[in-house]
Amino acid sequence: MRINPTTSGPGVSALEKKNLGHIAQIIGPVLDVVFPPGKMPNIYNALVVKGRDTVSQQINVTCEVQQLLGNNRVRAVAMSATDGLMRGMEVIDTGAPLSVPVGGATLGRIFNVLGEPVDDLGPVDTQITSPIHRSAPAFIQLDTKLSIFETGIKVVDLLAPYRRGGKIGLFGGAGVGKTVLIMELINNIAKAHGGVSVFGGVGERTREGNDLYMEMKESGVINEENIAESKVALVYGQMNEPPGARMRVGLTALTMAEYFRDVNEQDVLLFIDNIFRFVQAGSEVSALLGRMPSAVGYQPTLSTEMGTLQERITSTKEGSITSIQAVYVPADDLTDPAPATTFAHLDATTVLSRGLAAKGIYPAVDPLDSTSTMLQPQIVGEEHYETAQRVKQTLQRYKELQDIIAILGLDELSEEDRLTVARARKIERFLSQPFFVAEVFTGSPGKYVGLAETIRGFKLILSGELDSLPEQAFYLVGNIDEATAKATNLEMENNLKK
């Protein structure tokens, strides 16, 4: 782990000042810089442009070397706006890649791509920094044991379980509960696994980033009184940033997560919102660097760039990074190269359904569309696998019967189908769950449900033992015992009304 001042800091040491170049050309966020013969910087080195513009405003722009062009000239991509830069300006080669602060001091704080805090809470209290470019862990360091990452969320753990150290795609439109699900996962990993989370906001709306920060403070995921008690570090490179920043902000977040895994030996959750924007930024940079575009205008290095990021997200013998990535599918075309390349890396998909959200069933995870490579009897065990399959079959049959019910009504169904519908409606409601982070809004206390409890509950519903209970008893409860207790309370209330 490198211990040095971050390249983004205002001070660049006297040693680094020896290697000076000057700007020869500026095209948008891309700079060509000329260095003295024999003093060429390496690829990925950070360059710093300092000076004043025409109205004497201070300029401090960090760039990253992308190409060595020959004739002592390099091409670099700026990590912030290039407004005010001029030809002939002095450029300092820092002699190292971009480095960002890591460790416990990053929790509860918001950073930009350079690792600079942007939350007005003062400097970060750490001297430990780490370069954002590093190779993926070697094969010998990897933990190859397949194990489930228990989230405490019934619908996820039963029907589309997450792999420890795996990658999960999160699909869903606006307003179906992505943010609340993300915050609940951050909360549960801290409580159940003693782990921390890193959130990488890649090329999304600034307003959404601000909303997430405010909601995290409200729900206690970020502790304002004692910032060190927070459970998450935030790294933002939003839509208005140059493509260089959006392309590298995912690596900044990943570097912070790697420190928690490798040095603190913790289980880490890494959220990337949105992985498509990472690809999009790479495509913009690729065009600016003059590379020939590939299919649909994407960069020719699309698979390599995606692989470089994704291969660093894994389980090692020290700890694990489990990544949840929001995936935007352009024009709902799953064959588009960006989502298609992402799918190759995913172990599970969690699909959020607007129909379920409209019914008031939260989390609105679609039990039939969500998938996981972990749902195999040899991994999760026969009991879990059988229960999950029977739940899916019951829900699928209910879905097929809905058209008949809408036209002819329930009475026209056979006795067997009516029983299936009744159980499916109970299952649908039992898949809902009160969240800890939503206590503020719902007023009902959150519930963490262990996997064994989840399986027991669904087995009881499928066996028919609970057929006599009303379906509203299963809505927004934790384990099955709470559902039976709720049914007793409902019965008592009904008797009192009579």
Swiss-Prot record:
The terms under GO molecular function for this entry are: ATP binding; ATP hydrolysis activity; proton-transporting ATP synthase activity, rotational mechanism; proton-transporting ATPase activity, rotational mechanism
Q: Which GO terms describe its cellular component?
A: chloroplast thylakoid membrane; plant-type vacuole; proton-transporting ATP synthase complex
Keyword set for this entry? ATP synthesis, ATP-binding, CF(1), Chloroplast, Hydrogen ion transport, Ion transport, Membrane, Nucleotide-binding, Plastid, Thylakoid, Translocase, Transport
Pfam families, per this entry?
ATP-synt_ab, ATP-synt_ab_N, ATP-synt_VA_C
Compartmental location: Plastid, Chloroplast thylakoid membrane
Does the keyword Transport feature in the UniProt annotation?
yes
Could you name the domain of life of the organism this protein comes from? Eukaryota
**Matching HAMAP family, A to Z?**
ATP_synth_beta_bact
Q: What does this protein do?
A: Produces ATP from ADP in the presence of a proton gradient across the membrane. The catalytic sites are hosted primarily by the beta subunits.
Q: Which PANTHER family match?
A: ATP SYNTHASE, ATP SYNTHASE SUBUNIT BETA, MITOCHONDRIAL
* Name assigned to this protein: ATP synthase subunit beta, chloroplastic
Q: Which organism is it from?
A: Populus trichocarpa
Gene name of the record: atpB
